[in-house]
Amino acid sequence: MAVSKEDILETISNMTVLEIVDLISAMEEKFGVSAAAAVAAAPVAAAGGEAAAEVKDEFDVVMTSFGANKVGVIKVIRAITGLGLKEAKDMVEGAPSTVKEGANKDEAEKIKKELEEAGASVELK
């Protein structure tokens, strides 16, 4: 009779931390692997993700400050997002805040231009 993954996980969940450390050491010895090697590989994977992020199709429009024309910026936020007056006011006063997530480049540039014309400071991320 084979031992199922569920049985193994149940057994491990009932172990103490010291028992788990001993188990990991025994597995490293038995299979000739090192848990440290897997951890060291993780930053390499993250660095590869950053290279892929350079060619972006989607942008987040982030308002960093509303400038001197708070009322005008609130009006633009309401028009862009469809939020109510209170929600738009809270978004503007809570700057920096994300106005739009996952916008394509043209849409993000348009939103940025509208907000900057109203007096806000905007970043595309």
From Swiss-Prot:
Any one biological process term the GO annotation gives: translation
Keywords linked to the UniProt accession: Ribonucleoprotein, Ribosomal protein
GO cellular component assignments: cytosolic large ribosomal subunit
Signal sequence annotation: none
Recorded GO MF terms: mRNA binding; structural constituent of ribosome
Matches recorded under InterPro entries: Ribosomal_bL12, Ribosomal_bL12_C, Ribosomal_bL12_C/ClpS-like, Ribosomal_bL12_oligo, Ribosomal_bL12_oligo_N_sf
Sequence similarity: Belongs to the bacterial ribosomal protein bL12 family.
PANTHER family: 39S RIBOSOMAL PROTEIN L12, LARGE RIBOSOMAL SUBUNIT PROTEIN BL12M
Known role: Forms part of the ribosomal stalk which helps the ribosome interact with GTP-bound translation factors. Is thus essential for accurate translation.
Summary of subunit composition and partner proteins: Homodimer. Part of the ribosomal stalk of the 50S ribosomal subunit. Forms a multimeric L10(L12)X complex, where L10 forms an elongated spine to which 2 to 4 L12 dimers bind in a sequential fashion. Binds GTP-bound translation factors.
Identification of the protein by name: Large ribosomal subunit protein bL12
Lineage, broadest ranks: Bacteria, Pseudomonadati, Pseudomonadota, Gammaproteobacteria, Chromatiales
Gene: rplL
